[in-house]
Amino acid sequence: MAELSTRYNLPVNVTEKSINLDLNSTARWIKEPSVGGWTVKWGNFVFHIPNTGMTLLHHLKSNFVVPEWQQTRNLFSHLFKNPKSTIIEPFLALRILLGVALKDQELQQSLIPGFRSIVHMLSEWLLLEVTSAIHISPNLLGIYLTSDMFKILMAGVKNFFNKMFTLHVVNDHGKPSSIEIKLTGQQIIITRVNMGFLVEVRRIDIEPCCGETVLLESVVFGLVAEAVLREHSQMEKGQPLNLTQYMNSKIAI
C-alpha cells in the first residue's frame, strides 16, 4: 500500500529566522549622534535626523523676528507666543510620529487581541516615555508578534508616512495640511510645513462640568525634516509636493 512520506523536506527559510531574531527591535529605541544630527534605529527603520529647524523654532519663539515672520507667529501663537510651550528635539518629535503611526493602526484595524495589546504597549511607550527600551515578555512576543505580524506593523508605519505626504503645506486654499488624533489626556497635531512636519502635543483636561478643555500652556512641539520620512515613503502620482511647489505658502518654517 502506498503511504505518505516526509522523506524530502526543504530546510526552514533562513530569512524568516533572521527576521524572528530581530522582533525585539520594536521594543528598542537606539539613538546615536551623527554629523549634524542623530541616527535613530527602531523596528526595521534607520532614520537619519538632521538638526534642522531648531534654531529657527527658537528664533520664532523670541520677540526678535523680522516682520515677514509675524504671520507665522500669529498662526501658531500657542506655540511661538506662549512662554510655557516647550520645543523638543527632532528625534523626540519623530518618536511621537512613530507612536501615532502605531496608534493609528491600533484604532483603525481589526487586530487580533494579543497583537493589539503589543501595538498598544509600543505606542504608549513611544508617546509617553523617553526610555530606550520597553520590556515585553519574550513569550508574548513569540506568540503574537510573528514575522508576518512584524511585517504588517512596519508596513502600517510606512502607510502612515504615505498618508502624511498626502497633506498640503499650510496654505490659503483651504486644502488639508494637518492630521489630528485625540488620545487619553492629549491631542496630537501633525502639520505639513515648508521644512517638513511640525509635531505638537497638547494636554487635554476633562472636567465633568465643562467637558474637554485643551490646556495650551502645556504644549510641546518639534520639527521633523521632510527628508527623514521621504526615504521611507512612496510618492504617488498626484501627491502634493514640497516647498518649491507652494508659492502661496508664506509661513517661515
Curated annotation (Swiss-Prot):
Pfam families found in the cross-reference section: Filo_VP24 (PF06389)
Molecular function in Gene Ontology: structural constituent of virion
Keyword Secreted: no
Keywords from the named record: Host cell membrane, Host membrane, Membrane, Viral matrix protein, Virion
Signal peptide segment: none
GO annotation, cellular component aspect: host cell endomembrane system; host cell plasma membrane; membrane; virion membrane
Function noted in UniProt: May act as a minor matrix protein that plays a role in assembly of viral nucleocapsid and virion budding. Unlike Ebola VP24, mVP24 has no measurable impact of host dendritic cell function.
Family: Belongs to the filoviridae membrane-associated protein VP24 family.
Protein name per its UniProtKB record: Membrane-associated protein VP24
Organism of derivation: Lake Victoria marburgvirus (strain Angola/2005) (MARV)
